[in-house]
Regions:
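Short helix-capping/linker turns of helical repeat alpha-solenoids
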Residues: 46, 51-54, 58, 65-68, ...
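Short coil/turn linking the two alpha-helices of tandem helical-hairpin repeats
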Residues: 67-77, 107, 111-116, 142-153, ...
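TPR/TPR-like (Sel1-like) alpha-helical repeat modules
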Residues: 161, 165, 186-203, 223-228
């Protein structure tokens, strides 16, 4: 589990194209016009996911199952879909009607396993998500059109259009690619503008050294124009928080479903949201193991209701920041501490 600033996925965007002649609308028109019902196959419940579950938990479980596949078989094993990948696919398909984010992940795992799934299935997932301004899917289309993938030939114009759109919608890797690509084309004003967006001092200085005063003025002007087109930082943060809550919910449910016993989906969301927000409050609270241990101990302290702020308890705090303890050891020692207090 990583802090939200390190998540790979920067997923929440706003529609910027307002008329048929806008660049965004032209990009949308280059994609198949398919509904969600047309692209989502029918799937059955599995041992982890059912259609009755809420989408937040379904998304989190899908991601956790993908991680489990990597642990069991290695990240490079993509020729065949494992049992875990097949279950993850079903979970993510169930989540898709409310979580367009899941389509980015679906496109990735399906597109990498072409012995089991059609290339068109993967492309349609990515295309639908990109039309709905998911920056992860827009970046995916840049990758597809850059080299030619999923039965689509290389197309430099489309590739660069999707790259620039993903960058505007907050995908940091795409923003870095805009700096690199613009610099390679000697388009230093554009490179400078994107370096300013990234707010990386070394990158800004590296580009500035290659620029004339006139180019600097053009770069500042382009940067000012970009500011009005970028997805607001607060919206990106809210979306990342939402994704991290889903990820943490699925992770906890997969490994320790007892954490959520007796909770409604709304109560579970509030419980996990508190854990996620503590990642920002306490710098030493940042590992997956800490989150799992925290959730388990919190339920020991208070069986119902919101998560308790264990960081205010010196003895429990000391346990949680002890890197030498496993989750199981941390919880066992916490039980001992709590039992002594009841005597």
């Amino acid at each position: 589990l990583k802090s939200r600033s390190l998540l790979p996925l920067a997923i929440f965007t706003l529609l910027l194209g307002c008329n048929a002649s806008s660049p965004d609308e032209k990009l949308n028109n280059s994609l198949p016009d398919l509904s969600l019902e047309q692209i989502l196959p029918k799937v059955e419940a599995n041992q982890y996911c059912t259609p009755e579950m809420d989408s937040e938990l379904l998304l989190g479980l899908g991601i956790r199952l993908i991680n489990e596949d990597e642990v069991l078989y290695g990240a490079g094993r993509t020729l065949l879909a494992s049992k875990e990948i097949k279950m993850a696919r079903s979970c993510l398909i169930m989540a898709a009607p409310r979580y367009t984010t899941s389509l980015c992940i679906l496109g990735s795992i399906v597109g990498a396993r072409q012995n089991d799934y059609d290339k068109s299935e993967a492309f349609n997932y990515i295309a639908y998500a990109a039309k709905h301004n998911e920056s992860c899917a827009e970046a995916g289309l840049y990758d597809i059109y850059s080299v030619g993938k999923l039965d689509h030939p290389p197309n430099k114009e489309l590739a660069m259009g999707w790259l620039e759109r993903a960058a505007r919608h907050g995908d940091q890797e795409s923003q870095q690619d805009m700096v690199r690509w613009s610099s390679e084309q000697d388009n230093f004003p554009v490179a400078y503008a994107w370096a300013r967006v990234l707010n990386e001092a070394k990158t800004i200085e590296a580009v500035k050294r290659k620029m004339s005063p006139r180019q600097m003025a053009e770069g500042e002007q382009h940067y000012t124009q970009l500011l009005s087109q970028l997805t607001p930082e607060k919206d990106i943060e809210q979306a990342l928080r939402k994704d991290l809550i889903a990820l943490s919910s699925g992770d906890l449910y997969y490994s320790h479903p007892e954490v959520f016993e007796g909770m409604s989906p709304m109560q579970r969301h509030a419980f996990v949201a508190q854990l996620v927000d503590m990642l920002d409050l306490y710098p030493k609270f940042h590992t997956r193991g800490q989150v799992v241990a925290y959730a388990l101990i919190s339920r020991l302290v208070q069986s119902t209701g919101p998560a308790v702020d264990l960081w205010q308890d010196p003895a429990l705090h000391a346990l949680l920041i002890d890197d030498d303890l496993s989750v199981e050891d941390t919880v066992t020692k916490a039980k001992t501490i709590l039992a002594k207090r009841k005597q």
